[in-house]
Amino acid sequence: MLRRIRRADWPFDIRRVPFFYGWVILLLSTLGILVSIPGQTMGMAVFTDPLIDALGLSRTQLSVAYMVGTIGSSLFLTRAGRLYDRFGGRLMVAVSSLSLALMLMFISVTDQLSGLFGGGPFFSFVFIMLGYFGVRFFGQGVLTSASRNVLLLWFEKRRGLVSSARGVFVSFGFSLAPLALAWLIAVNDWRWAIW
């Protein structure tokens, strides 16, 4: 099955598409980077105050957990790059997207998990640090890198043009994300918004 997924003609033969399929890849690459917003700093920063309240941590403790999770995730990104080279962008984007979603669900229940272990700042710190590790690794790291690299395989002559076009939409999305997430938190609550 894995061998079949890695083939260029799965799930359909792109040579039969009546236009250059690289333009579809441009759209998907842009979406892949935008989907990584929860793993980016500007995506997680909106949840700082709700997480402080829910976990009972100080701002410094939450910041240290974020830092440790970020540094820890960076140590594994070279291994993810090797997996990208081995399995290809399609599989890495799919797996990292699913893993990012699971890590966001994990973060939404970190205070409840901490409560199962008696609560307190230690378990809250450990669980949110693991959550930060996951969203930084799968979102900011693997998903963003894989989405960027997938596009480069499709374009040679127009690589600068498509990279800059993608950059415009990504910048626009990244600038709107904190406002949209803050609105979702205000309308519902932080757990609902993080899902």
Where do the PLM segments sit?
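Intracellular juxtamembrane helix-capping segments at the cytosolic ends
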Residues: L51, G139-F155
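Helix-to-loop junctions at the C-terminal end of transmembrane segments
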Residues: L75-G89
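Hydrophobic core of transmembrane alpha-helices in multi-pass small-molecule transporters
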Residues: L34, M103, F117-V142
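Structural signature of the two symmetry-related core transmembrane helices
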Residues: L91-F106
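Structural signature of transmembrane alpha-helices in multi-pass secondary transporters
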Residues: Y66-S73, R166-F174
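Helix-loop-helix hairpin linking two adjacent transmembrane segments in secondary transporters
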Residues: F169-W195
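Extracytoplasmic
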Residues: Y21-R59, F76-A80, A177-P178
